[in-house]
Amino acid sequence: MSVSAVGSFWLSPSPGKLPRPRMVVRSSAVSVAPILTHLQKQCATPLPVLRHVADAMAADMRAGLAVDGGSDLKMILSYVDTFPTGNEKGLFYALDLGGTNFRVLRVQLGGKDERVIATEFEQVTIPQELMFGTSEELFDFIACGLANFAKKEGGKFHLPSGRKREIGFTFSFPVKQTSIDSGILMKWTKGFAVSGTAGRDVVACLNEAMERQGLDMQVSALVNDTVGTLAGARYWDDDVMVAVILGTGTNACYVERTDVIPKLQGQMSSSGRTIISTEWGAFSNGLPLTEFDRDMDAASINPGEQIFEKTISGMYLGEIVRRVLLKMAEAGALFGEYVSEKLSTPFILRTPDICAMQQDNSDHLDAVGAILYDVTGVKSDLSVRKMVVEVCDTIVKRGGRLAGAGIVGILQKMEEDSKDLIFGKRTVVAMDGGLYENYPQYRRYLKEAVTELLGLEMSKNVVIEHSKDGSGIGAALLAASNSKY
């Protein structure tokens, strides 16, 4: 998944054209308090639930490493086995394609003493028609953007003589990686329907387009954004072992020993380690789900899939809250005699909206009232607003705590194979994504769950650090550490 797709929860599915406000009469007058109480009970994540989730995550990881298709978790091999050391020197580029924009970036590296001397980046919006065009059209457009960006190179940026410019390519769509610099596109997602790419090597597609543009560059590393985040954070801190993206969608990757990956079948890396992309959004074992989750899943474009993602990531939290409020409005007259048509519109309430409501500290919760009115067309008094905030908190608390349990599951799996190498010393988890960055309550619940599961002493060794937009630099660094030179 990508920074633009996963890493920012400010993107949300367009709900389409809103219907004209029409009033529908509520069905019955039941008090809403029991609905909230029942919701809180179903969403509860006491320690035994968290422990089950962490253990199941570790077990699913093992099964996914044993054989392809062994569990819900794909456990994709990244082929990254040389990590940035800090000694890298020279000029490297990164290209990040993961949503409706792509980013191009250049970085001048100065080795151990100077590290990152300078960086520059640009963002380019992909025209809607190219998302439904041919492979050549899309990649020609990207190569053209890259060529225009490369033309502006100057100042502190200079390529050592006799070298070709090298790129780290962050491509955040489902890819079956075949080496550090090649991967077959399995299918387009996120609203893309480009013809002629599925089943092809995406690096070859880009290389051919660069040739057509007369651009003398080559891809040295193909990565997803989670792997890029890990590499970018590890460049500054050798203790980084895990990277997690929590934004519109979610994923996690970590550093694994190659001798504990049965499906590698004896292929060893020079360092004895590699990065595994867990694709943990597909995890589903033992999660506390409600009727609202089941209904939302059934109505989604991928029913029965990505259940963990649908419980913890930014694309879905607002929608779950909306579904709860709709039931409260219909069954318990939460917003009066009528239910606004807007409240019945899927995805009209976004995670940034529920985040903003939870930040309201005013006496009358004026911001909550304004958001409810502006976004869902309902009027509310103070007691109603308090209940709405409780609903938001219930859904966000569950999401944050389950994400924390997932992180502990990854650490547990690593610890089982390398006694005291994880919990016995400082271990850093690099976090990126708009949900983690912008939602303080979510962040707090995540960290509390990690502490509860590990205990106060052991959890002191686990450092959760925000690594903002690390995946672009990370991709350039992986191009450098896997450089042909």
Write out the residue ranges for each language-model feature:
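Short, glycine-/Ser/Thr-/acidic-enriched flexible segments
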Residues: 249, 259, 283, 322, ...
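Generic beta-strand/beta-sheet core signal
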Residues: 170, 223, 255, 432-434, ...
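Glycine-rich phosphate-binding loop and adjoining helix at the ATP-binding site
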Residues: 123-143, 147, 175-234, 238-242, ...
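Gly/Ser/Thr-rich active-site cleft segment
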Residues: 160-218, 224, 237-238, 248, ...
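Short glycine-aspartate micro-motif
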Residues: 92-96, 164-168, 221, 241-245, ...
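ATP-binding/phosphotransfer module of carbohydrate and carboxylate kinases, centering on a glycine-rich
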Residues: 2-165, 236, 293-485
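Short beta-strand scaffold segments in enzyme catalytic cores
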Residues: 102-107, 228-232, 243-244, 250-256
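Short, internal active-site loops enriched in acidic
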Residues: 172-177, 226-229, 433-437, 469-471
